[in-house]
Amino acid sequence: CMSALLDNGDEILIPSPDYPLWTACATLAGGKAVHYICDEQAEWYPDMDDIRKKITSRTKAIVIINPNNPTGALYPREILQQIVDIAREHNLIIFSDEIYDRLVMDGAEHISIASMAPDLFCVTFSGLSKSHMIAGFRIGWMILSGNKAIAKDYIEGTKMLSNMRLCSNVPAQSIVQTALG
């Protein structure tokens, strides 16, 4: 997904600590991973002032991992709204890694940031690897939502990349049908 977005030197905001694949993908695509602080003293929530300080003219997107891996933090609506406001102000794409969305506990509620930002372009990632404990089957998806008009080139690039791939394996397709009903 980064190859379709980033040109050499473009920046993407990524939480720290993060799941290392995000940094690797940004770097592999020729971009620069710019890490924003998620402070343990603040329940591992993103530091909005730090995010704002790190936005430049080269910043294309912001990544959130909610629920967060590795911290386990689940972002409340107020935190998500602040991220939406920053993304809106700076015309950033939102990449939302929500692979742990079905694994919240103690009555907590997961809120997808895309549901709060219909005017922004959001790319939401999820799958069955974690929630159904079938990581080896590599079953996942990305959902493009919001203002797709501002992301035509990105969508076209993503289509080209996906067309170069074969479909998932047959047992995995059967598992998806069973798991999602």
Name each region found by the language model.
Residues 34, 39-108:
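Active-site phosphate-binding strand-loop segment of PLP-dependent enzymes
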Residues 4, 24-26, 86:
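Hydrophobic/aromatic ligand-binding patch that stacks against planar heteroaromatic rings
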Residues 115-181:
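Conserved core segment of the aminotransferase class I/II
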Residues 1-11:
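Phosphate-binding glycine-rich loop
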Residues 27-34:
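A short helix-loop-beta submotif of the ANL/AMP-binding
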Residues 29, 89-90, 120:
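Helix C-cap/helix->beta junction micro-motif
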Residues 18-22:
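Conserved coil-to-alpha-helix start sites within the AMP-binding
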